[in-house]
Amino acid sequence: MAKAHSSLVFCLLALALVRFAQAKCTNGYTFLGIKELSEKDKQKLLDFHNKFRELTAAGEAPAPKGEDGRERRQPPAANMLELTWHKKAEKQAYKWARTCEWKHNNATDKAGNSMGQNLGRKMSTEKTDVDDTFDKWSYDLVRGWFDEAKLYKYGSGFSMSTGHYTQVVWANTSQVGCGYSYYMQIDEYNQKWYTGYLVCNYSPAGNFNNREPYEISKEKCTDPKLESSKNYKHLCVLKKKKKN
């Protein structure tokens, strides 16, 4: 019995080592870990996104200051959906985060439609691990995307400087899935940077040219296909079809 148990432990350890060896950065950086998201982790990322969507839908998200220097707010949204978790989006984000590549890839849904994608990274000269940095940095990374609202003027169209924000609050985006990795890179001054890398994929994609991220209205969920979310006062969900 003890021998069988020892063999099982050895096999599991060998499998873990093989998986780690296969998970290499494709750009020469040193791979240090990939986050295996628990249900709690997924809910945390969902909550970050939905709370920022709620702020925008409520008309409380920051906007560029006016000419008089006063604070401004983004207009409220009529039809912004509450996000749910997308397993396929998560799987693709996981695979891309594992490459450590700081560029977009073409994530697609089951139908082959392109998904939206946000990338974020945070760096430190202090080495820790993937779980610790995810816990400490994941909120800051999503918040960094949302903070682009301070640069976004509603109706101005797509901009590279505000595209993370507009994807986060794109009204008819209904699902998100993310992946997170941790790696080390060395800069031109031979300084080691330990980097947390968050990839989030969105379905359906946002950031279409000549379209606004949402409709402006103080009235909520007026579309007959929508009803109010039970979790967020200013967000909507699709009505469930009644069974015959």
Swiss-Prot record:
- Tissues showing expression: Salivary gland (at protein level).
InterPro entries, per the entry: Allrgn_V5/Tpx1_CS (IPR018244), CAP_dom (IPR014044), CAP_sf (IPR035940), CRISP-related (IPR001283), V5_allergen-like (IPR002413)
Describe the location of the SCP domain by residue ranges: 46-202
Q: Tell me which positions the record assigns to the signal sequence.
A: 1-23
What's the short name of a Pfam family annotated to this entry? CAP
The main location is secreted
Mind listing the GO biological process terms from this record? suppression of platelet aggregation in another organism
CDD domains referenced in this protein's UniProt entry, alphabetically: CAP_euk
One annotated Gene Ontology cellular component of this protein? extracellular region
Cytoplasm is among the record's keywords: no
Identify the SUPFAM superfamilies for this entry: PR-1-like
Q: What Gene3D superfamilies does the record point to?
A: CAP
Q: List locations, semicolon-separated.
A: Secreted
Q: Which residues are glycosylated?
A: N106, N172
Which PROSITE patterns does the entry link to?
A: CRISP_1, CRISP_2
GO MF terms here are: toxin activity
Q: Which UniProt keywords apply?
A: Glycoprotein, Hemostasis impairing toxin, Platelet aggregation inhibiting toxin, Secreted, Signal, Toxin
State the function annotated in the UniProt record: Inhibits host platelet aggregation induced by low doses of collagen.
Alphabetical list of PANTHER family matching this protein: CYSTEINE-RICH SECRETORY PROTEIN-RELATED
Q: Which family does it belong to?
A: Belongs to the CRISP family. Venom allergen 5-like subfamily.
Protein name, please? Answer: Salivary antigen-5
